[in-house]
Amino acid sequence: MADKSHVNNVPMQGNGAYSSHAALQHEAMLKALPLFQAAAEVIANVDSTRISIVEYGSAHGNNSLEPMEAILKSIPTESLELLFSDRPENDFCTLSKTVTAWADGIVGNQLLNPLFISMIPRSFYQQVVPPKSAHLGFSLAALHHLDHVPQPTEDGQDESELLQQQAHVDLATFLKLRSQEIVSGGSLILSFVSQASAGYENYSGPVDACRNAMIEMVQQGKIPLSVAQAFRVPTYNRTLSDVKKVMDEFTQTWKVHDLFEDDVMHPAFHKLKIQSNPSLEASHKYAEVVIDWMMAVCSGYFTKALQVGSQGGYTKQEEEGLLQVWVTRTKEFFIRDYKDKEVICSFIYIRLERL
């Protein structure tokens, strides 16, 4: 069992902050919509009075709704059950507001059938719903987050190899659990950040700016080196080969209909490039948007590093102050070193059928 410092128990930034800064995830979701439409055609032929759809890793729900609508439009069933799940630390208040407002708007208008909504505070690396109870499951922009950071081995095995092994175990665990939950003939749709076959580093500008800002804070004595050493975002970007190796273990359980890689650009870059010669104000606005996007994911891990690296030596107010310093300096480094640079990311997309 991993100790608490290695467990991935940090939620996305709460109080609507993550949902307000998830534009790249939205772009990635749009590329997955054809997979949902294909899965919906299969579900439409299911002879059942109740159809159950489960999302694994809903966060605040803002990128859950268009996939749900793509499915609901094609399902002529008597009742629909939508289940939104995430880790217990997730901001379920924001998720509830997002989903409820959306459901209230479509029931009786676009949707005539009863709609039943549930939220489940449970990691998708555990069983989330009863066996053979779901007709379609999906997870978007979440599965690159690992269950935990693997601890160093006595033989000094390379960290990247340990992360790759953990990512293999985690994806296999996820697929095994979902195979128990999804009925035969049901579908599973996945998208997650991947290692680009083209060789570029995902969102390299923001990542480097974050790193340099933290190094400067250490050099200036703002934070001790132990905090920087404790900072970890427990993710691994799988290659297509990594994914295929896992899928080879499930040939008797899952049929692969789609498996491909695609590039996703942060939409703020397109808005910036509409201007032939962006103003300094536009460049600063772009930096604000892309760094706030990254911080919506990473800020909680910085706060955790402050707690672990200082052994609880900071007050809540001091943690918030240091976080703000890090965010501000990251934006300054991005403007200095990566002004107007594209923010691009590779995603892997998968559509599976339960055999």
UniProtKB/Swiss-Prot annotation:
It holds the Pfam family Methyltransf_7. Coiled coil: none annotated. Binds 1 Mg(2+) ion per subunit. Pathway: Mycotoxin biosynthesis. S-adenosyl-L-homocysteine binds at residues 18, 63, 86, 123-124. InterPro entries: MeTrfase_7, MeTrfase_capping, SAM-dependent_MTases_sf. One of its GO terms (molecular function) is metal ion binding. Keywords: Magnesium, Metal-binding, Methyltransferase, S-adenosyl-L-methionine, Transferase. Disruption phenotype: Accumulates carboxy-fusarins. Its cofactor is Mg(2+). One of its GO terms (biological process) is methylation. Mg(2+) binds at residue 231. It is an enzyme of class 2 (transferase). Its EC number is 2.1.1.-. Belongs to the methyltransferase superfamily. Type-7 methyltransferase family. This is Methyltransferase FUS9. It comes from Gibberella fujikuroi (strain CBS 195.34 / IMI 58289 / NRRL A-6831). The gene is FUS9.
